[in-house]
Amino acid sequence: MRTTIRDIQQMRDRGERIPMVTAYDYTSAQIADRAGIPMILVGDSLGMVVLGHDSTVPVTLDEMIHHTRAVVRGARNALIIGDLPFLTYASPEQAVISAGRMLQEAGAQAVKLEGGVHIAPTIARLVHLGIPVMGHIGFTPQAVNQIGLRVQGRRANEARQLLEDALAVQEAGAFAIVLELVPAELAQAITERLRIPTIGIGAGAGCSGQVQVWHDLLGLYSDFVPRHARRYTDLATVIGEALTQYVHDVRTGTFPGPEHSSRMDPTELAAALGNLEES
């Protein structure tokens, strides 16, 4: 049975930490689902770790829908949240169309939007129409060209703004909020002042849950390793070694072996070849 927003809220209310990961394809979603991950984010981070862009900005809504469909097919139990990419929710009206496509065409159960006070009316509009929304404040990757890649909220005025953002997103009806690259002390203070779960990434252990990018978590992406990421394994090395062995086996003729091939009755083969030669 698929995890619901109510389930996530109850986890928060019980003090149960909430793990979330990103996934971008059917196979990864299957693996995450089997591991018991209750929420999967189809993040626009796919622009970097899957499509090879320098940021999330070039990602399109069609690309997000394509990948979200695959994740929905792969994960039967997790709550699936689809990112709305850059400039697909510039107005409440545009957000309704974009979020509607994410739910209707892709099959996501919720969408995620970046922004605080200024985006709250858009969140409220979506929630009013029955579209569940996860918020995202702090470092917002879609604004990287404007704010740069840095921790947000270290100064008192910035911290106050982030708290106002979090409260505005909550009051607009978001069911959860991502806190990215926020000082741990501030993230905990925000968490304690909200009724909804906070999901941290580079925001310390005081959040209601944590999210990590699939490729960072598993050691698949070497172009850039965020400080806040913990590599639980080094799949890039494991996969590289496997592919090197495959190349060796093909070139030396040790693959495929007899066990990897099907056989044919010699008389049938002779008859077939004989017919070919006669023709």
Swiss-Prot record:
Organism: Chloroflexus aggregans (strain MD-66 / DSM 9485)
Cofactor note: Binds 1 Mg(2+) ion per subunit.
Keywords: Cytoplasm, Magnesium, Metal-binding, Pantothenate biosynthesis, Transferase
E.C. number(s) listed in UniProt: 2.1.2.11
Record InterPro entries: Pantoate_hydroxy_MeTrfase, Pyrv/PenolPyrv_kinase-like_dom, Pyrv_kinase-like_dom_sf
Residues that bind 3-methyl-2-oxobutanoate: D44, S45, D83, K112
Single GO biological process annotation from the record: pantothenate biosynthetic process
Quaternary structure and partners: Homodecamer; pentamer of dimers.
Protein name: 3-methyl-2-oxobutanoate hydroxymethyltransferase
Similarity section: Belongs to the PanB family.
Species classification: Bacteria, Bacillati, Chloroflexota, Chloroflexia, Chloroflexales
TM spans (from-to): none
